[in-house]
Each structure stands twice: as structure tokens, then as C-alpha cells.
Regions:
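N-terminal amphipathic/basic leader segments beginning at the initiator methionine
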Residues: 1-15
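Small-residue-rich
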Residues: 31, 60-61, 70-73, 88, ...
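Short glycine-rich or small-residue beta-strand-to-loop segments that form or flank ligand, phosphate
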Residues: 32-44, 66-72
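An N-terminal, globular interaction/scaffold subdomain
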Residues: 38, 54-56, 63-67, 82
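Histidine-anchored nucleotide/phosphate-binding helix
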Residues: 43-62
Length: 123
């Protein structure tokens, strides 16, 4: 049986990551982008590195890019944490979402509609 996995010894290089992210932008003209990476509690996921590279690729193409860390129930990302995780991105680019106070219900998606658009994959 052929192995369907590969053990990485060195991880993905910045060049490989940039190449993959560039490929995702091919044929697209993006004006406004919101990136929602995990917060500092997931630092080791490398999401900050991915976000930073994506941010610079997008802004070089003229896109307005905002970043809103997905806090879940955690505290907002501090400036010190931001500078470690999201290297090269100004702290002011972060949109802080106050999950305790600023979540407003604007409607409800009926289950029947979800079933229809997902061809019964979601119930």
C-alpha cells in the first residue's frame, strides 16, 4: 500500500509559502480583504507568518487589508503579542472584536435553506 502522507522534516519555507499564496491570488483583483487568523493562543500554528506574507502580497497589489484575530473567548491581542505573531504589520491594522458586547443577531438562516444549498450535506 502506498503511503498517503509525508513526514516533514523542515516545514514549509517562506519561499514555498509565498509561492502557494501567490497562486491563490492568480486572476483575482481584490480591493478589500479581511483576514481572520487565530489569536496569540495559537502562535505555534504559524498563522501569523502566513497572515504576514499574505498581508504584504495583498497590499503590494493595492488591496485594503484588515486583520481581525479570531478571539473565541480569549482576551484581545496585546501590542507585544501582535509584534511577535504578525511581524511587519502595523498594530493599527488589527480590528478588535469585543465578543462580549458587539455581537448582534441580524437574522437566522433556516435549516431548509442550508440543506438546499449544500445538497443535503448540512442538516
Amino acid at each position: 500500500m502506498e503511503d498517503i502522507y509525508k513526514i516533514a522534516v523542515s516545514g514549509i519555507s517562506d519561499a514555498e509559502l509565498k509561492e502557494a499564496l501567490l497562486k491563490s491570488l492568480e486572476g483575482r483583483t481584490l480591493k478589500k480583504v479581511l483576514i481572520i487568523p487565530p489569536d496569540f493562543t495559537r502562535f505555534h500554528s504559524q498563522a501569523g507568518r502566513i497572515t504576514s506574507i499574505y498581508y504584504h502580497l495583498l497590499t503590494e497589489r493595492g488591496a485594503q487589508v484588515d486583520i481581525m484575530p479570531a478571539l473565541g473567548t480569549h482576551e484581545p491581542v496585546s501590542k507585544a503579542q501582535w509584534e511577535i505573531m504578525f511581524k511587519g504589520i502595523a498594530y493599527e491594522k488589527m480590528l478588535v472584536h469585543d465578543w462580549r458586547h458587539d455581537v448582534v443577531k441580524i437574522g437566522e438562516v433556516p435549516a431548509s435553506y442550508l440543506e438546499e444549498i449544500t445538497e443535503n450535506l448540512w442538516h
